[in-house]
Amino acid sequence: MLLKSTTRHIRIYTAEVKNNQLIESNNVLTLDVDPDNEFNWEEVALNKVYSKFDELVESYNGEELSEYNLRRIGSDLEHFIRSLLQKGEISYNLNARVQNYSMGLPKLG
């Protein structure tokens, strides 16, 4: 059964992508970061999210693969993305389809 966790900026699936399709997997997690392009991402910041994801997944090694645990990982990644925004490592995409400033109003500097 396909398990998933979806937050505003993070989607995690127990699946792998093949031919633009999600194929269920018990061995692979797929991470989709900021699917609505709410933020401007530099490669360094995006790699930090991937590294944090790997770290969080490793911390659950040996535990049940459940929607609850996936939600915990997704929630932790949401907080991590907020910290990147607060540190100025990412910024809001002012050309995004919707501007809702879900992580707080932008800082004018």
From Swiss-Prot:
Membrane-protein topology: Peripheral membrane protein
One Pfam family in the UniProt entry: NdhM
Domain of life: Bacteria
Catalytic activity reported: a plastoquinone + NADH + (n+1) H(+)(in) = a plastoquinol + NAD(+) + n H(+)(out); a plastoquinone + NADPH + (n+1) H(+)(in) = a plastoquinol + NADP(+) + n H(+)(out)
GO CC, any one term: plasma membrane-derived thylakoid membrane
Keywords: Membrane, NAD, NADP, Plastoquinone, Quinone, Thylakoid, Translocase, Transport
Keyword NADP annotated: yes
Subcellular localization, as worded in the UniProt entry: Cellular thylakoid membrane
Enzyme Commission identifier(s): 7.1.1.-
Function: NDH-1 shuttles electrons from an unknown electron donor, via FMN and iron-sulfur (Fe-S) centers, to quinones in the respiratory and/or the photosynthetic chain. The immediate electron acceptor for the enzyme in this species is believed to be plastoquinone. Couples the redox reaction to proton translocation, and thus conserves the redox energy in a proton gradient. Cyanobacterial NDH-1 also plays a role in inorganic carbon-concentration.
Subunit structure: NDH-1 can be composed of about 15 different subunits; different subcomplexes with different compositions have been identified which probably have different functions.
PANTHER family: NAD(P)H-QUINONE OXIDOREDUCTASE SUBUNIT M, CHLOROPLASTIC
Record family assignment: Belongs to the complex I NdhM subunit family.
Name of the protein this chain belongs to: NAD(P)H-quinone oxidoreductase subunit M
